[in-house]
């Protein structure tokens, strides 16, 4: 690397003779030396120039500067008649060390100048700056054949400070140095002096120090100064973090990462780091420190908050003045103390003013209707400075004679509620008739429970009127016969007077329009003339002087059959029927034993009956596995499916006549002694799910998941349980859960699979909300799609694809599991499995599968789109709280789930493609895998997010944006989602109604100061949930 520096300029007369004597800075600087030296004005000019060059940049640390060495340099020149030192002093008598050589008339010059040992002070890369003058060979008469215009520079690394015995060939050449400008006799005549500056770097260095050497090969040169230095990034304070002096790296392109330390009274927000470049510059700052609570940033330091000011959190930039009704007399306050009779809840932000309980409600009025009372009032004059005012109703029953009151008790009902009332009205029902009551209406707010003062309430005294009795609640059956039912009951809890009679209404079930009324003064009746073996519905109500009460709830009782015996009849008819049935069954068995025709029909499904009815006839069937032809056995095992070499085809285990045969063909039997159950991790449809270890002979121990079949299972449950193993055993793919084997020869019956440490995908995502990059989420989706492609290629339909049925291991590998609802798809692309009833997971199921119960690989693609939505939303419930019927209706009308927050546009478009109504328009799983692979290979395509405003604008407009007023105020909504701290901010920025809140976007939240990602997501998700009540949240296709 060649550098150029400042060029000193001076004027002097040419020397009188000696053409081989150069004009040297040393001779020019000899202000007080021999008369043969340069004039005084020239040396003063050069000395001044040299002094201006002494200051080095702040990022350069000198290891040697010949201009500043006060004593002898200690350099060695050889041969002795080569380099010579010209020792001069400036006007301050400071030495100036200069070396010159000018052997241009002699051939084969080899003059060396060696420096003393130079310590590198830990630097691995150093720089050498040379300042020199050089005579133009053309200006030297007679020296053209021997004169040179370059010289060489070398170095030698050494830990020895006294090692001067270094051979020439041990030195390593740094470079050949040439002058940018050389001087001639014309320059001498014009009084111009030309000074060259060259810089070279050396590295990496591995020892403690080094020597420099300069070789002259026949030039006329003067070495004015030598400066050796290394570069550093100087100590600096950035973002309240101190970064120390840092020596640059050995590589010219290397960036050294340096960690900073926070200044006093500050804490780490994100660990502060910067990168030191090879040129000694600080680059790429990362992270920062923040002044801790009670301190604020000023001039790069953290200054204490003054009395009367506070700062509650490091995330707040400046100290703020204490809010109303609070104060602080201390420095470094993190909160302010409330004034007397003012309070602050723990959930109130420190920036909120201190508040007090409200005054009493005003102008309470009552309206009595028999045994119910309606109260109404107006809000208190003083709300205490809070917006969370609610009301509590205290009820007291008073004795008009003694003037004593007691609590009403639990029988009184309050509509809508007793406490937490937001409206200024309430109704009390189920009061006692002819009773004096006192109702106290108390206004409370968020700090009422913190105040030791007296309750603030208004009282209302009322007397109830005469009322009808309450409903009959406890009805018991008595004697039941084929034509009659006897019942008894207890008096109503609140008769509200003397019971005059009871009215009993009954009718045959599902024939309510034809009923019978019986009246009784007792609490028992017998209804007669009923039909045998029929269900009857009874309702009872009481009557007082005030009239009838309401009917009781419905009670159902069934009469006995015609042949059934009542409590006082004999058991003869029952015995007779039992004997008759037994005779019929015996006749059937004898008929089967006498008839061998079932075995003459070949080896169909009747063969199993043949073996049970007549074991001696098994040989006639020709179906015993021991005697079976291998080809016949093969055809039987595959039940008509032809297996081509190299082609894997799924075989439905339900087509096997003997389900156990399917299990043994596709699943490996494991000895129970090889399995160690460690703990229960869940419960399945058939029993417990455990984790444990599997140690097979000659193989390493494996962690496994173990499904067990519960005790007391039926044969059908056993078949269904092992059926899943028969399905899993046919699959071999890294994204399909792997079956290790089954245990069927001992109890409990077990299915053993690989163990997935992180469990189900939906639960895992909820636990790790927002913790993964988009690429990681796409990687999960890619694994799921690869597994589904494998199943689809085998002609297999899953039917229940959802995040809950995807398992994920510690390496974030997703695997498809849970084949309980799965069925086979034939080779015909139009074939589909028709279910035989049963539950369908509506939120994940394609519309054609819901409507016609037809399942195809295309319906699995629809379900995969829902899984994509679950993954990107970190396990949110699809369609939130919409009912299944609302989901079916919305999807049928063409609406789709909105994009999750911060969802890449490419992923949401793929979701919408999976949700095409026409199943043939949906992508195939192999196309989905290819699309996701492209996204992974090109991460920049995932940076474009679905526009938040578009997500809102695409929602249905004909419905209320907030679900028909689910919340009456912004404060109530924020409190409900535990975000009440932002109430004041919303109100101050004009979001005072729920309709205004409906238009809030993510950018609006950031502008309002909601900076925590978790809080942003909670608020946006709540808004989105409200928007999708009924079908508000669906995006039309």
Curated annotation (Swiss-Prot):
InterPro entries: Eph_TM (IPR027936), EphA5_rcpt_lig-bd (IPR034277), Ephrin_rcpt_lig-bd_dom (IPR001090), Ephrin_rcpt_TKs (IPR050449), FN3_dom (IPR003961), FN3_sf (IPR036116), Galactose-bd-like_sf (IPR008979), Ig-like_fold (IPR013783). It catalyses: L-tyrosyl-[protein] + ATP = O-phospho-L-tyrosyl-[protein] + ADP + H(+). Almost exclusively expressed in the nervous system in cortical neurons, cerebellar Purkinje cells and pyramidal neurons within the cortex and hippocampus. Display an increasing gradient of expression from the forebrain to hindbrain and spinal cord. A motif (PDZ-binding) lies at residues 1035-1037. Residues 60-238 form the Eph LBD domain. The chain crosses the membrane at residues 574-594. It is an enzyme of class 2 (transferase). Residues 595-1037 are cytoplasmic. Residues 675-936 form the Protein kinase domain. GO terms for biological process: axon guidance; ephrin receptor signaling pathway; hippocampus development; neuron development; positive regulation of CREB transcription factor activity; regulation of actin cytoskeleton organization; regulation of GTPase activity; regulation of insulin secretion involved in cellular response to glucose stimulus. Glycans are attached at residues 264, 299, 369, 423, 436, 461. It is found in: Cell membrane; Cell projection, Axon; Cell projection, Dendrite. GO terms for cellular component: axon; dendrite; external side of plasma membrane; neuronal cell body; perinuclear region of cytoplasm; plasma membrane; rough endoplasmic reticulum. Its main location: membrane. Phosphorylated. Phosphorylation is stimulated by the ligand EFNA5. Dephosphorylation upon stimulation by glucose, inhibits EPHA5 forward signaling and results in insulin secretion. The modification Phosphotyrosine is found at residues 650, 656, 833, 982. Residues 965-1029 form the SAM domain. Belongs to the protein kinase superfamily. Tyr protein kinase family. Ephrin receptor subfamily. PANTHER family: EPH RECEPTOR A5, EPHRIN TYPE-A RECEPTOR 5. Receptor tyrosine kinase which binds promiscuously GPI-anchored ephrin-A family ligands residing on adjacent cells, leading to contact-dependent bidirectional signaling into neighboring cells. The signaling pathway downstream of the receptor is referred to as forward signaling while the signaling pathway downstream of the ephrin ligand is referred to as reverse signaling. Among GPI-anchored ephrin-A ligands, EFNA5 most probably constitutes the cognate/functional ligand for EPHA5. This is Ephrin type-A receptor 5. It comes from Homo sapiens (Human).
